[in-house]
Amino acid sequence: LNSSFPKGIGKRSPSERQTEKMLPPWDGEMSVEVDKLIRYVEDERERYYFHYGEGFLWERLPVGTRVIYPPPTLPPIEDVDEAIEHALEHPYGSEPLSALLRRGMKVTIAFDDISLSLPPMQPPDVRQLVLEKVLSKLSEKGIDDIHIIGAIGLHRRMTPAEIKHIVGERVFKAFYPERLYNHDAEDKENIVWLGKTDMGEDVEVNRRAVECDLLIYVNLNLTPMDGGHKSIPTGLGTYRSIRHHHNPDVLLQTSLMDTRHSEMHRSLERIDRVIHEHVRVFHIETTINNATFPWYLLYLQRAEHEHTVWDRLNFHISRNALKVMPTSLRRAIFHATRAPYKMTSVQAGDVEEVHKLTIENLRKQQVVPVEGQCDILLAGMPYLGPYNVNSILNPILVNALGPGYIFHLFLNKPLVREGGVLIFTYPLHEDFHPVHQVPHKDFYEHVLKRTRDMKEIVAHEEEFATNPRYIELYRRSYSFHGAHAPFDWYWGYRAQCYLSKIIVVKPRVKHVAQVLGYETADSLSDAIEMAKDVVGPNPSITYFHMPPIFLCEVK
């Protein structure tokens, strides 16, 4: 270990260090005037771009439409190496990491998988920076019984290249594959059942993670939904345990991003408390700014009224060129995108104290205060969600991203009123990745095409979760666990119950919308007219202009 990972490896040269200043804690104030983030359409000739899968639309909006933009990009930490060192040695609710370490101890490090960030970061990933610093400290203490586990939960296994992108080449070469590997939720010998919570929820988790002397969790927080008590139960759990918080009854009582009103997070907290009774955990959480797009896509980081001549030219050339490209080429281009995200905070120690600070820093970057709900919510659906990195946004994942995540990007109450209408643009298709999404395709063909009744769908869940073929593909190939197909469908359940209509604009294959329970429109204006049938002739309309990811705090 010492030869491959010498002391001080976590230190980076000045040229590698990120620039600007470290964020102050969230103080409840916006860093920019809200009126710069919320605009109203004043002229019917104005046009706005909408994400449309691996492409874009250029649309007019009705006069009076409220357009909500993400906050500007916050400056990153000036000296990341120093910030990580400070976090590890000045933790919250815990002794310093160096004080927890002793020669001969057994240490397990877990890290968030490729579902974060979106898109993947330009190297170095913040998890790499944290891992290198942690491993340097372990090396200094003479600790060599170290395993590093990708906390994939029931997601598909990460490929060697995907793991290397997150952890960096030095960590990868030193530990892969014997001591750097994906969590396996179906490896019975390396899973341990710890009992039940006081609500009867099974607590089942990776054996190595709880039978070590110290578990270190390295997190990347992209939204308030993640991190905290969610990290270990989801990332290192099994179907037997995860089913308790990934089900329609719980999700119907869950605000994904507002954990104060989330039954899912209450369940995760109960499960995580049992886990923490069995192993000492040192949590390291990080946040990043919203620098989502590389230099050649910077026009997507700006509002239309801020576009330069070059931005407009670049956008329209890209939009029209993408129209004539084959789908496979468009997907390859978009999935090659690497975001220039930079770290804005790092904090370590006790799970609850750490996560409180993480959420404060997320709010500083992501929250836009908004007055009032709307009747019709417009959104452009991009090519990428948490479950299709380097893959395909199949029909099930469209439901998870639209009625699931996009609908839930709020605090307090949804941006659209109950009984309102969600309209999104996406070239809806019937494509599934042949390796990653085997259970999704079968779920779509054999369950959703027959019924959308939730009770009937839930009755199929265990069949998918225990199917030997899906289990083998999850363990030996790169397919999602069988249970994840129905789980992804459940993700949109609250919105499906809450809204009167969901309308998809310009689908490529219209009958897919019928299977999903959506209506279709050939244009955005047609969709708005269709929505008026249920919300009335003079609706309030809001265009939720994302990505970058942000949250509306609705009053």
Residue spans for each PLM region:
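Histidine-anchored nucleotide/phosphate-binding helix
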Residues: L118-G142, G404-L415, I423
